[in-house]
Every structure is written in structure tokens, then in C-alpha cells.
């Protein structure tokens, strides 16, 4: 059996400010978030000589601006746009997994100087009220995702054990997501006592990735993986969500709900 062990005292800090600005012709939500991560740890000085000295890992400071604008085009229709930056830190295991080297070993080690995954998202859409209880919404979106983790195998010449190899996660991959979402919202009405929300999304997710045999080839030769733009394994082209509720309010009220999801990919 295998196990992971690490004992670290990393520091996380975050704060944000947000404001809503209402004008005669449009409404704007603006904000900014600040995140700070200090691993308070050390990482290998040279990837080609991992058994040598360690150096202190750097602090990561992240500013995330976000903006949303709603522009009424009729009494019952709204155009909306949003833009934002989002960050996600790697798991503690990928940051702090202990370095264990030895004869015949090919360990996966942590790298506490990893950068956070960064997503920049754009969305543009329209919402239209069809009746007192019914509304539709359509939007298109695009996500640019950088600094995804890629598992790298590195061959090196150990001064103690001779030819050796190890694996490490590095910020090397990226992906892009493009898609469209259509939704229908029905508010509860006294006649049917039913409320519902239905939405359908179509998206494509592509990024740089390695072929299924590249990792083994790399472990034998020490060559860099050959990367190309391909559909990613976690892509879901079609996603349909539905929530339907029937309720009767009051002291002796009751309610029943149905939730469903269908997806491909």
C-alpha cells in the first residue's frame, strides 16, 4: 500500500469588495477580490538535480476583478454581460508531498512553488419575460483556463543512486471552454401550484494534452511530452438540468420536488 505524508503550516488570506451602481439606463455590479497564499515551505532548486539544495517557495498574490452589467431593452427584456478572473490553488498533496528518493524508486514529489490555476470568463446573454410567470434566458460564454497541472516525468543522474527518475506536477497545461446556455424559468402560480427551472447547455472543451502512451515513453527516454490541442476527457458537450416543484403553502402545507440531470461526454 502507498500513502501520503506531509506536515506544513501554509497561510491563506482573502478579501473582497463589491458595489452595485444603478443608473437610469443600466445597472452595474463591480468588485475585486484579493487572495494571498504563502506556502511557508521549500522546493527543489533544480528539477534536474532534485536531491540537491532546496530554496524557499514564493508567496502568491492574486487580484481578481469582476464586473457585471444589465441593460434593459424593454420593460420585460434585459441584456446582460459579465467578465471575471478566478483562481484556484493546487491541492495540498501536489504542493507538499514529501520527496523520497532511493535506489529503484520513481516517486511522485510535491512542488510547493506551483502557481494557482487561473480562469478568465466572459458571458453575454439576454433575458426575456414571456408572461407573469414565465421567462427565458439565453447566453453564450467563453472560459480561458491557464496554469493547469500536468504530471511530468524527469530523468536525471543521481549522485548517490545513478540514473533515476521521478514525477512532479508543473503548471504546463491550458484549456478553453466555449458554449451556449438556454434556460426556462416558471414561477409558481396559484392554479397549477407548480414552479420549474429547465436549462440546456452545449459546450466544447479543448486544451493541450498528452496521448495515452506518452507518459510511459517519457519515463523511458526523458523526452518532453508531445502536446497538441484535443478535446479533453472531462468535456460534457450536452448538459440538461431540470427542477420541478409542486407546493401548497399554509399550516398544513405540503410540497414535492423532482430534480433531473442528463449529460453526454
Predicted region positions:
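Signature of Gram-negative outer-membrane beta-barrel scaffolds
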Residues: 1-74, 100
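Extracellular loop and loop/strand-boundary signature of outer-membrane beta-barrel proteins
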Residues: 2-5, 47-56, 107-112, 165-171, ...
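Repeated loop/turn-to-beta-strand initiation elements of outer-membrane beta-barrel proteins
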Residues: 25-28, 76-79, 132-136, 191-196, ...
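Outer-membrane beta-barrel strand-turn architecture
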Residues: 17-25, 36, 63, 71-75, ...
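Residues on the lipid-exposed face of transmembrane beta-strands in outer-membrane beta-barrel proteins
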Residues: 15-21, 32, 67-71, 124-128, ...
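Surface-exposed extracellular loop regions of Gram-negative outer-membrane beta-barrel proteins
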Residues: 38-47, 71, 75-121, 142-167, ...
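Hydrophobic, lipid-facing positions within transmembrane beta-strands of outer-membrane proteins
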Residues: 11-17, 63-67, 110, 120-124, ...
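Gram-negative outer-membrane beta-barrel transporters
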Residues: 141-144, 155-156, 161-264
